[in-house]
Amino acid sequence: MSVIIQVFSDYVCPYCYLGEIALQRAAEATGAIIVHRAYQLRESQLQESGPPKLAPGGERMNAIWENTIYPMANRLGVDIHQPSRSPLTRLAHEAAAWARQLGVLDLFQRQLFNAFFIEDRDIGELSVLKQLAWNVGLNPNELEKVLAEHQMAEEVEEDLMIARTYNITTVPSFVIAGHVLSGVQDESVLIKAIKLAIAGELGAEALKLPHLPVNIARS
């Protein structure tokens, strides 16, 4: 029996980037199937102007990076840098939905995270998304058409609707057998949850699993 892990994440969330490592390892160890779903931390600002609420450089955000994100990245051996921008990610999610349709979602997501957290590029810009598409063997001009026509908008909206169904307001969030685990989870925690789900016992044990406060809430 293969357990499905629904993962809600956003490409501007450093914890989502770092959490991918434990997630992939847990899936490999158990045979679980990962289903990535879109979540927009700045969805409420899509029609607003002014500086983003998740803008880097403030005292609070700097403290989070110094006290939490960098130490976690060091433990995992992951290269990550605090970005200088906080773009809207709707186009990135639509591009990712298109990449999933073409069977290269994992590669494209890796490109998105690397572009933002290592290269400090604006993944809300069409030109950047086209370059990332090219990097994974996709046609950048076709992507431009897909995004201009919002061909994948319905898929993204469906993910956001599912997130609301589970009352998800922070990322990363994992849904396993109908139960939500919030925040970055250790590989061992995910493996335990998957095994409990296979045994049909996750309902009784879900509340005993740690819900780590290592996540980011929607602004």
Where are these regions (language model features)?
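Short, intrinsically disordered, charge-biased short linear motifs at domain edges
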Residues: 1-3, 60
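C-terminal cap of thioredoxin/glutaredoxin-like
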Residues: 3-9, 15-31, 36, 97, ...
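Structural alpha/beta surface segment adjacent to cysteine/selenocysteine redox centers
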Residues: 17-119, 205-218
